[in-house]
Amino acid sequence: MTGNASGRKPLNLAATQGGASGRQKKLPAALLFTDTLPDDLVEVGYVGAAYGIRGWIKVQPHADDASALLHARRWWLLRAPPAGVVSAPAQSAEAVSIKISQSREHSGTVVAQPAGVSDRSVAEMLKGRRVWVRRADFPAAEEGEFYWVDLIGCAVVNEQGEALGEVTGLIDNGAHQILQVAYELPDGKAAERLIPFVDAFLRTVDTPARRIVVDWGLDY
């Protein structure tokens, strides 16, 4: 997702199949990924349906900005987390790795043709799987833009050097993005600060150092 923060834009980019006869279908062995999953995978969408009759799939991105999906030439399709779990760490069980031959945006989704898949029935077996791509395969962010995944986990301090907490998420309220910053109260209870991700409060964002400096008081 792209959001406007006065020049700073954080980019957001987290079932058993059966045939008509009731027999379980198995994915082609060539699609199964048996090695260790890359450690920089980021969940960016899910397979909503097969598209057409030639093995294309339709993916619903998790964010308005689908640039990561369109830029990456290899996707990992992993089983959805258990019911009630919104997202979960990538698990290698029955992981599918596909090379993308073609992809394009289509009515708020991304449609793609996996290499080696030319049959709609195989594409249908991928429905419901979460789509992960490597962070290394994201397109480079433009000046003043940041991917949300790079902001989460950053320490937040103010100009006085006082620790404000750690970024645990972001909210898009339509006008701008808001950092969700978790911290601990003196009595040990967890609390949260909501800091607008706009130039009025931002001083520096150093993602390699995992540090964000803001104009924000401890008592705000």
Swiss-Prot record:
Domain spans labelled PRC barrel: 143-220
Disulfide bonds: none
Signal peptide: none
Keywords annotated in UniProt: Chaperone, Cytoplasm, Ribosome biogenesis, rRNA processing
Annotated transmembrane regions: none
GO BP annotations listed: ribosomal small subunit biogenesis; rRNA processing
Annotated localization: Cytoplasm
Domain of life according to the entry: Bacteria
GO molecular function: ribosome binding
Quaternary assembly: Binds ribosomal protein uS19.
Family, similarity comment: Belongs to the RimM family.
PANTHER family: RIBOSOME MATURATION FACTOR RIMM (PTHR33692:SF1)
UniProt free text on domains: The PRC barrel domain binds ribosomal protein uS19.
Designated name of the protein: Ribosome maturation factor RimM
Gene name of this polypeptide: rimM
